[in-house]
């Protein structure tokens, strides 16, 4: 009897072959991932004046949506081809390998950033950074127990909640590919079921057993945007047409959702324009529809509209993405895990610098640019290491000759030796 994994492998090889466009890395993907890395840095620097002007201040969706959507697209490139060429088991093994890397990245980043906060407290003679800034008092109240829970992902610290969500989304890929081998509509049913569980029934995971705090990024809800990106890059979801009516509709959505977002100039805080215009009641009414934790429908709509406009703006195939700035963004976007981890550290380090230097215009600008420069340096350094410069490079002619000999049939090579 043929085993289920073998059937899945055959189905994957025969029916899940990626579209041609999924085989080539899309320059738009790297560009927008790079942009997202800088926005995430700026957004996470405590009390950062620059954070008042990031895209999240003008609508419901933000850089987290961009990060997860692009991660879904990148996962389709990195893993989808393995499922198609090598079968389900090898594809699942490839996903497990990446999940293992991200798991240790999560654990390591927490240890390093907390060490930075402890060092800052010792230097200043306070408990400000561990207690007030990072809210680690519950963690230190039961260090031994919480370290065990940290390792088992049953304790998710504040500031460190996106990688655990990403881990579970990665773990869903083998399930999604198995369903797609049967029928792609099963994938849609699976993802929508998870989304309904999160948004309608409030199903979520516990981030802190001591307080009952839930995961800030509920993977059941965020699977929708992740696998939307995954589906686009696999060719399961067709690219939208360039249509003036769609452009107008997307613009209308983006503009219409700016006031209800109650951010920046429409702030619903006391004295803000939003409060005087009565937008605060509308904001509270739409809160569940805009849920960041469960990925509410208005958030999804806003991101799709924004993404469509950005897709149109860069031109077909990203042809308008040229020049040194674009290349810099792409280089950063090609090393997102390393850059993201550096951003977690630098956001806290930059916040400390602003605490000590002040938050004037000049110092804020200098500190933000310093943090961005570090991310760029990390991207280039990691890229250099990945190129394995210590390996001996074979001359091009020798490489071509070797490749030609490997393509020559063994019988022809034997005949050549005899002759």
Can you annotate each of these PLM segments?
Residues 2-419:
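Alpha-helical transmembrane segments and their immediate juxtamembrane cytosolic regions
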């Amino acid at each position: 009897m043929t085993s289920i994994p073998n059937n899945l492998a055959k189905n994957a090889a025969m029916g899940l072959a990626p579209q041609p466009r999924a085989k080539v890395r899309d320059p738009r993907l790297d560009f927008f991932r790079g942009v997202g890395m800088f926005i995430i840095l700026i957004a996470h620097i405590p009390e950062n004046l620059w954070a008042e002007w990031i895209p999240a201040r003008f609508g419901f969706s933000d850089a987290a949506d961009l990060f997860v959507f692009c991660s879904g697209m990148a996962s389709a490139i990195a893993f989808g081809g393995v499922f198609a060429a090598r079968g389900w088991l090898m594809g699942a093994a490839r996903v497990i390998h990446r999940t293992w890397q991200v798991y240790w990245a999560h654990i390591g980043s927490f240890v390093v950033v907390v060490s930075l906060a402890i060092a800052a407290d010792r230097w200043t003679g306070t408990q400000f950074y561990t207690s007030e800034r990072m809210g680690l008092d519950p963690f230190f109240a039961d260090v031994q127990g919480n370290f065990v829970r940290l390792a088992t992902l049953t304790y998710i610290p504040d500031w460190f909640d996106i990688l655990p969500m990403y881990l579970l989304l990665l773990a869903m890929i083998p399930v999604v590919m198995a369903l797609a081998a049967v029928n792609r509509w099963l994938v849609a049913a699976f993802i929508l079921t998870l989304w309904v569980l999160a948004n309608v029934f409030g199903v979520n995971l516990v981030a802190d057993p001591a307080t009952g705090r839930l995961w800030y990024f509920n993977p059941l809800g965020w699977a929708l945007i992740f696998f939307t990106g995954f589906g686009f890059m696999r060719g399961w979801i067709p690219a939208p047409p360039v249509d003036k009516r769609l452009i107008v509709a997307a613009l209308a959505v983006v503009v219409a959702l700016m006031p209800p977002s109650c951010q920046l100039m429409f702030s619903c805080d006391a004295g803000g324009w939003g409060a005087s215009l009565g937008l605060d009641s509308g904001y509270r009414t739409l809160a569940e529809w805009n849920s960041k934790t469960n990925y509410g429908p208005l958030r999804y709509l806003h991101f799709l509209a924004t993404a469509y406009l950005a897709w149109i703006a860069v031109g077909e195939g990203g042809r308008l993405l040229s020049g040194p700035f674009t290349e810099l963004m792409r280089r950063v976007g090609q090393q997102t895990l390393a850059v993201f981890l550096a951003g977690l550290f630098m956001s806290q380090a930059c916040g400390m610098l602003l605490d000590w230097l002040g938050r004037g215009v000049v110092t804020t600008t200098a500190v933000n640019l310093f943090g961005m420069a570090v991310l760029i340096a990390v991207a280039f350094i990691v890229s250099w290491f990945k190129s394995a410069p210590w390996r001996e490079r074979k001359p091009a002619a020798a490489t071509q000759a070797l490749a030609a000999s490997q393509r020559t049939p063994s019988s022809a090579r034997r005949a050549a030796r005899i002759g």
